[in-house]
Amino acid sequence: MQPTLSDSDQILVNTHIYDFSSPTTGDIVVFDPVQSKRKQAIKRVIGLPGEKITLRDGMLYVNGDIRKEPYLKGLPHYLGLDEFSCQLEINQYFLLGDNRSHSTDSRAFGPIMENQIAGKALLRYWPVKRAVYRIK
């Protein structure tokens, strides 16, 4: 998730927020990856149920429209990555890491189900010099 989050960052996660609402585009979520040996992982919600996600020519498209991603801060988004397309079903979400060229995300393990999402990352409290009230 670099540059947004680093491996050593400590974050506060709201584990009840999705009891009352569903994840939205741009949310940074902690989830339980079925195909991974890791207990939990953290990625950004890119696609919502019913949407079509396409990566083509270095750009992200959602339902055919280019998705602006200001949080990538000038990183090479998809340099050297293969084209990819995915139609999301009911209760499926498409997650990507912010460091797209070095991220294992829904391009590798596929969409995740809503019940795999454990919570939303709210704030980074450590290290103190990088503390932020709201992770974007």
Predicted regions and their residues:
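Soluble "head" domains of membrane/secretory-pathway proteins
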Residues: 2-136
